[in-house]
Each structure stands twice: as C-alpha cells, then as structure tokens.
C-alpha cells in the first residue's frame, strides 16, 4: 500500500525516466522541491518495498511493479487535468487542484471520471452544452 508521499515520488521518478531515460536523486529533489536527503530516504523505502532498485552513486530503476504504478499515477494525474479542463476550471488553477485531490479519490472514482471525460470527448456538442449551462448560471448569479 502506498502513501500519498510515496505516490508523488513514484510518479515523479516515472516521469523523469520517461523524459530523460534516468532519474537521479538531485533531479527528483529539484522536481519535488525537497532536500536530496529526503529523496534518498524515500528512495531507500521504495527500494525496500520493491518499487525500484537503488544503488548508491549508480542511480535507480523502477521495478515492473514500480513502472506499473508509476504509469497509473501519471494517467490519474493527466486524467484529472483533462477533467478539470473540460468542466471549465481556470488553467492556472488546474495543477494545484489536481495535486490537492488526486490522493483522495479511489481508483473506482478515477475510472468513473475517465468515463465522464470520454463521454464529453466523444461528442464536442456535450462540452458546448456544458459551457452554455455554465454561462447561464454565471448570468443568473450576477
């Protein structure tokens, strides 16, 4: 079972490896705005829990278990960003909102949000209809 903090690290490590081909402690620390010693401590825990293999001074690699979870965490994050965009959340608020909610939703809720995103994306008229409702509500609330 992963904690929200473990998920943040696994997600960031997965993204760094996808982007650069590797993830160093210093890269992870910079991306998460934490001290390198905190990264080392968490990486050792993730190694112990078999999410990654860490060798001091040699770097780290995700295990198949770590890759699977990392991929799912990135999917969750991107899906929630899509969802908030569809429902009209201001772009500059989306990242922080996703960070605030992503660890508090069950995977069942994430799957249902995925269904809703697909529903809207399957027919752009649905998004237009939503925008009309939002516009009408804004006018009524003024």
UniProtKB/Swiss-Prot annotation:
Domain of life, per lineage: Bacteria
Binding site for Mn(2+) 1: 8, 99, 102-103
Record's subcellular location: Cytoplasm
Disulfide bonds: none
Main location: cytoplasm
InterPro entries: DtxR_MntR_Metal-Reg, Fe_dep_repressor, Fe_dep_repressor_sf, HTH_DTXR, HTH_tscrpt_reg_MntR, Iron_dep_repressor, WH-like_DNA-bd_sf, WH_DNA-bd_sf
GO aspect biological process, one term: intracellular manganese ion homeostasis
Keywords, ordered alphabetically: Activator, Cytoplasm, DNA-binding, Manganese, Metal-binding, Repressor, Transcription, Transcription regulation
Residue ranges of every copy of the HTH dtxR-type domain listed in the record: 1-63
MF annotations from Gene Ontology: DNA binding; DNA-binding transcription factor activity; manganese ion binding; protein dimerization activity
Function statement: Central regulator of manganese homeostasis.
Family designation: Belongs to the DtxR/MntR family.
Record note on quaternary structure: Homodimer.
Protein name: HTH-type transcriptional regulator MntR
Gene designation per UniProt: mntR
